[in-house]
Amino acid sequence: MQQLNPSEISDIIKQRIEKLDVASEARNEGTVVSVSDGIVKIHGLADAMFGEMIEFPGSIFGMVLNLERDSVGAVVLGDYLQLEEGMTAQCTGRILEVPVGPELIGRVVDPLGVPIDGKGELDTKLTDAVEKVAPGVITRQSVDEPIQTGLKSIDAMVPIGRGQRELIIGDRQIGKSAIAIDTIINQKGKGVTCVYVAIGQKQSTIANVVRKLEEHGAMEHTIVVAAGAADPAPMQFLAAYSGCTMGEYFRDRGEDALIVYDDLSKQAVAYRQVSLLLRRPPGREAYPGDVFYLHSRLLERAARVNADHVEKLTNGEVKGKTGSLTALPIIETQGGDVSAFVPTNVISITDGQIFLETNLFNSGVRPAINAGLSVSRVGGSAQTKIIKKLGGSVRLALAQYRELAAFSQFASDLDEATRKQLEHGQRVTELMKQNQYSPLSVAEMAVSLYAANEGFLDDVEVSKVLDFERALHAYMKSEHAELLDKINQSGGYDDEIQQGLKSGLETFKSTQTW
């Protein structure tokens, strides 16, 4: 061992003293006063900001939601059972952010962006704030491009445009999620990235949805954000905002995205739970006063933005492209009561609603869409030309049928015109039925609607209408593939297409008996 003389030792000590960094680091630190039900009260965080992340020992984080005179109320994002009174809590100076980017596609993540599908870590390069301000009026563009759901009753009667917010509302177990999942499946190959946000659902239900999306090749363009029924209430109410941020990444880069919130009723219940635990005053149905703002600030973020907005956000990398985020929020009603607090709120925020009815579902009309109460306020201008032309008379036929069906229950003898309208309405109602996971192309839909409008179904038995439709689609695909391709590509409706549809249907009817 080398011997050091006393002068060298003193030199080394001097060097170490000179290198010593004694700059003080100011950190705002408080003490946990109480922990209960995922809510933490902290004393001493005078500089805490609303929505700021708070760090506890053991890398547990919370979010500030209450700013009181002598304490701060925060929700714990994770396992609050590890926290105790007297522990320290530190301000981070950051707001909640989640990972964003194309790396998330095909993955299942929790509301904080942590993967929960067992497929390894995420290699995302960017993060973005969960709470963001919606695009202003000047940066928006009118909705004029369709989102094809592949469902006849929606695309023909309640069309949805890119950048629209269309509410799906109805009682439990009548096919609300099925409509949303079919829409996601139908976006395959259409350049639309989908985000499915599951809020407060059973883990088995979420797993089943993911499995179905994988079976139909839809996970290749879908991100699933899952906050199960067993997850803490703060995670359930944050899930929607996290999913929205992930969808906005694509919107702000000139791409199209679709987000499904399944469902916002459970999000409102989770937010009510958090608010009551934070001792905020309850209002109607015990919801807090800002439950309208909870949903409005979320749904206003779904929009179609103009090319200038996209160019500005991408620093000039993307030019001349508009972006869109289309929202399909789902609301569950109790006993068909759409006048409850949360349903009326969301109806007033969205650009229309698809109303599902229990009676229709039980009588075999699936999807169980009530054409009279369902409406799309902006989708008409985004509808494909051929579907707009052929779909108008379908809605009219169904409206007249409902009116006459109610009247005919009391009338014993009906005149010929009324009887014909009733029979036509029965066939159109039957034609609007569609199996789950079997979305139709624009051309297939056009063929079905044309057959209904031009009276080709009038001599077909009501019970055989769907068999007739299946056989017709198979015939048109084999004999008139060019015509179907032309309709799918252009979406137009001219004399040539009309003549092609007419001759195809006439030939089909002449070769087969129904």
From Swiss-Prot:
The residues forming a coiled coil are none
What Pfam families is this protein classified in? ATP-synt_ab (PF00006), ATP-synt_ab_C (PF00306), ATP-synt_ab_N (PF02874)
| TM ranges | none
Site (Required for activity) location in chain: 374
Q: How does it sit in the membrane?
A: Peripheral membrane protein
Alphabetic keyword roster: ATP synthesis, ATP-binding, Cell inner membrane, Cell membrane, CF(1), Hydrogen ion transport, Ion transport, Membrane, Nucleotide-binding, Translocase, Transport
Return the CDD domains for the record.
ATP-synt_F1_alpha_C, ATP-synt_F1_alpha_N, F1-ATPase_alpha_CD
UniProt xrefs under InterPro entries: ATP_synth_asu-like_sf, ATP_synth_asu_C, ATP_synth_asu_C_sf, ATP_synth_F1_a_nt-bd_dom, ATP_synth_F1_asu, ATPase_a/bsu_AS, ATPase_F1/V1/A1_a/bsu_N, ATPase_F1/V1/A1_a/bsu_N_sf
Gene3D superfamilies assigned to the protein according to its UniProt record, in alphabetical order: 2.40.30.20, ATP synthase alpha/beta chain, C-terminal domain, P-loop containing nucleotide triphosphate hydrolases
This enzyme catalyses: ATP + H2O + 4 H(+)(in) = ADP + phosphate + 5 H(+)(out)
Compartments where located: Cell inner membrane
UniProt: ATP binding residues: 170-177
Write down the EC number: 7.1.2.2
GO molecular function (one): proton-transporting ATP synthase activity, rotational mechanism
| GO cellular component, as recorded | plasma membrane; proton-transporting ATP synthase complex
Q: Does the keyword Transport apply?
A: yes
Main location class = membrane
According to the record's subunit comment, the protein's assembly and interactions are: F-type ATPases have 2 components, CF(1) - the catalytic core - and CF(0) - the membrane proton channel. CF(1) has five subunits: alpha(3), beta(3), gamma(1), delta(1), epsilon(1). CF(0) has three main subunits: a(1), b(2) and c(9-12). The alpha and beta chains form an alternating ring which encloses part of the gamma chain. CF(1) is attached to CF(0) by a central stalk formed by the gamma and epsilon chains, while a peripheral stalk is formed by the delta and b chains.
Any idea what job this protein has? Produces ATP from ADP in the presence of a proton gradient across the membrane. The alpha chain is a regulatory subunit.
HAMAP family with a match to the protein in the record: ATP_synth_alpha_bact (MF_01346)
User: Cross-referenced PANTHER family, in alphabetical order?
Assistant: ATP SYNTHASE SUBUNIT ALPHA, MITOCHONDRIAL
Which protein family is named in the record? Belongs to the ATPase alpha/beta chains family.
Name the UniProt record assigns to this protein:
ATP synthase subunit alpha
Species in which this protein is naturally found: Chromohalobacter salexigens (strain ATCC BAA-138 / DSM 3043 / CIP 106854 / NCIMB 13768 / 1H11)
Highest lineage ranks of the organism? Bacteria, Pseudomonadati, Pseudomonadota, Gammaproteobacteria, Oceanospirillales
